Each structure stands twice: as C-alpha cells, then as structure tokens.
C-alpha cells in the first residue's frame, strides 16, 4: 500500500506539470508582447514537435507512474525529473529577462514540482515483504 501511495504522489505531480504548462501557454497568449514576438518568429515543425513532446511526456509519465514496476518506475522518474527540472530552470531564466509575476509563478512551480518528482523517486521506499 505504501508503494501505491508513492506512485500516486508522483503521478499527481506529473499531472500538475502538464496543467501548469497548459496554463503557462494560455497566459502567454494573453500578453501583447508575447503575441507580437510569436508573429515575428518562425516556428518550424521541429520546434512544434519539441513543444508537443514537452507536453506529452508529463501526461504519459502520469500513467506510467502508476503502472510501471517499482525499479523501472523509480529510475525513469529520477531521470525525467532531473531532465525536466533542468529544462524548466532554463525556461525560467528566459522569462526573467522580461518578468511577469504570473509567468514566474507558473514556471517556478514547474521547477519545484519536477524537483519533487526526482526527490520522491530518489527516496522510493524499499519493497515491503
């Protein structure tokens, strides 16, 4: 039962990550400067694919976190927790150049959430016998 509780915690954190990224995008489209920048830059298929994968992975991980076996679950959550923490820190630093409180709050929360995913996976309890 203890293991299931850890799996659900991590799964909920991945869902939070996906919802926060959706919120970030919606709020970004409400900022005039962001919309103007988007019209000026060209977003190719590679960038669109990267963004889709960046959204898709947390949703897949929410499902895998409750279905994978313990060892695989622990390792994939540690690895992706670190990867997404680093990516979110990079994303946060980009927004610090032109800060808006709501974006800093949302992106900052994704840094904390992905760090917690790593932490929970690292502290995964021993299998009960």
Give the positions of each predicted feature.
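Alpha-helical transmembrane segments of polytopic membrane proteins
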Residues: 47-55, 91, 104-111
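Membrane-helix boundary connector in multi-pass membrane proteins
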Residues: 73, 86-106, 125
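Membrane-water interface at the C-terminal end of transmembrane alpha helices
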Residues: 112-129
